[in-house]
């Protein structure tokens, strides 16, 4: 978990990946071999292999651009009770054979609820109910406060189960809203 500041946050799933392209369903075959060779030639073996293992970003660019591995989403607030969630799969230039796979993955992952995982929809619904709670505070974001550290780049980092990213987003939103 990384809080980059100013509401920008990242969930780093890469420690859970060991092999190349695990984040893409362990893709293989001649198309993959050709793509790997081209990127290794362009970027060097070490950089290319790291990218293939780590996968794309899982991040929120404040206020509403979400990069969810192979999906791109924009959340457009309409009112306190409603928002529009636009999403599209990320397509790659130069490997059209993969774009069909990326589209199918987006359809499977994003589904009719427009969330990456069914659990996310449940969580969003519970958060919406929390907006109507008559108790204060209705939302607690303390998990992992004791594990947060600051890395050499000035980012607040913590364990994958911590709420560092939530705190970073809401901290910045509060500062922006109180300045308005």
Language-model segment annotations:
Residues 1-180:
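C-terminal catalytic domain of Rieske-type non-heme iron oxygenases
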């Amino acid at each position: 978990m990384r809080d980059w500041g100013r509401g920008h946050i990242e969930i780093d799933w890469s420690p859970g990946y060991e092999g190349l392209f695990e984040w893409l369903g362990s893709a293989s075959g001649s198309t993959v071999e050709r793509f790997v060779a081209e990127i290794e030639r362009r970027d060097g073996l070490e950089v290319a292999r790291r990218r293939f293992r780590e996968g794309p970003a899982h991040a929120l660019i404040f206020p509403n651009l979400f990069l969810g591995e192979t999906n791109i989403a924009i959340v457009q607030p309409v009112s306190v009770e409603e928002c529009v969630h636009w999403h599209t799969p990320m397509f790659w230039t130069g490997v059209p054979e993969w774009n069909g796979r990326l589209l199918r993955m987006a359809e499977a992952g994003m589904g009719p609820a427009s969330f990456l995982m069914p659990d996310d929809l449940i969580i969003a619904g519970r958060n919406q109910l929390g907006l109507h709670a008559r108790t204060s505070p209705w939302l607690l974001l303390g998990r992992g406060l004791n594990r947060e550290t600051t890395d050499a780049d000035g980012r607040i980092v913590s364990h994958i189960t911590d709420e560092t990213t939530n705190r970073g987003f809401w901290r910045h939103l509060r500062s922006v809203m109180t300045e308005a």
